[in-house]
Design a protein with these regions (language model features):
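Short beta-strand/loop motif that positions the catalytic acidic residue
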Residues: 231, 237-239, 243
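N-terminal cap/lid segment of alpha/beta-hydrolase-fold proteins
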Residues: 1-19
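Conserved alpha/beta-hydrolase "acid-adjacent" motif
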Residues: 244-250
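Conserved HGGG/HGGXW glycine-rich cap/lid loop of the alpha/beta-hydrolase fold
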Residues: 13-67
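Alpha/beta-hydrolase
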Residues: 139-226
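Catalytic histidine-centered segment of alpha/beta-hydrolase-like enzymes
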Residues: 245, 266-282
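Conserved acidic catalytic loop of the alpha/beta-hydrolase fold
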Residues: 76-94
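Conserved hydrolase catalytic core segment
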Residues: 91-135
Length: 289
């Protein structure tokens, strides 16, 4: 496993990050899903080298080796990401936000448009008020209901059981959370390379407890702190037609408020199926940089 490094943030916090691929390659910042960690990377171990990419992943606050940040917001995570880029000496870079990493990638584009040379979303999250809960898988539907009707404490109480499961049996937690996902997602999760990568990321995400997930999930359901129209870089978007984590109707509403460079709806694909197109997705961003 590659070396983990940290960058210090105000108040003595640290943000942990890991490099993959060629350190002299084209810079690519990958923003992991929810829950997740800096071990979220391609299941294809040779992909980054083939693309001449220096890919970097980082733990959002409370996940993995990054400190908890009680005041964390979508925008504060974007500032953490910029601190990682500074530590790497990156003046400009491509960014891909995956699932819950999507809003943070958009925030990064809003914060530093002069440095984000290409901005992509692969099944990236949408504003929660765009979502019809009936379009979601059970864990997301109930989590959103609790935030809307009962508040943060209820959300954390609901997530406590799957979080405990993730700490002891991340594979079991993954299976339980995705039990009512579309068949195409379950087929992807059955692939040993995909499953191993996701389970490793989940295990690391909860190594210091569940607070990272609690804070991350809550932040994603709240207003993001910026308007979609304030994101000046054009966005490349890849979404699954059958996704029940990020429903396509809500994605289309978000796209109508962004500057969209390209928007591809992947037919017959759920939340995980974008990985079938991963090399093309990353090449698009790196070649646009």
């Amino acid at each position: 496993m590659p070396e983990t490094r940290t960058v210090e943030r105000p108040g003595g916090r640290v943000v942990a990050y890991t490099s993959w691929g060629d350190p002299g390659g084209r810079p690519l910042l990958l923003v992991h899903g929810t829950p997740g960690s800096r071990l979220s990377r391609s299941p294809d171990p040779g992909l980054y080298a083939r693309l001449d990419a220096h890919a970097v992943t980082f733990d959002r606050p409370g996940y993995g080796a990054s400190s908890v940040h009680p005041e964390r917001t979508i925008l504060s995570v974007a500032d953490d990401a910029l601190a990682v880029a500074d530590a790497l000496g990156w003046d400009g870079f491509a960014v891909l936000g995956v699932s819950g990493g999507g809003p943070h990638a958009l925030a990064l584009g809003m914060r530093a448009p002069e440095r984000v040379r290409a901005l992509g979303l692969a099944v990236g999250g949408v504003p929660s008020d765009f979502i019809d809960p009936d379009d979601l898988i059970e864990i997301n539907r109930e989590g959103l209901r609790r935030v809307r009707e009962e508040g943060r404490e209820s959300l954390e109480a609901f997530l406590a059981e799957p979080a405990a499961k993730a700490a002891s049996d991340p594979g079991g937690m993954l299976d339980a959370a995705m039990a009512d996902a579309p068949p195409v997602d379950l087929e992807m999760l059955a692939r040993p390379d995909v499953r191993t990568t996701i389970v490793e990321s989940l295990r690391e995400a909860f190594v210091n407890g569940p607070q990272g997930w609690f804070d991350d999930a809550y932040a994603l359901t709240m207003p993001w702190g910026f308007e979609l129209g304030d994101v000046s870089p054009s966005v490349h978007m890849w979404y699954g037609e059958a996704d029940r984590n990020v429903p396509i109707k809500a994605v289309q509403k978000m796209a109508s408020q962004l500057r969209v460079e390209s928007f591809e709806i992947l037919p017959g694909v759920g939340h995980m199926g974008w990985l079938l197109h991963e090399e093309r997705v990353l090449r698009t961003l790196l070649d646009a940089d």
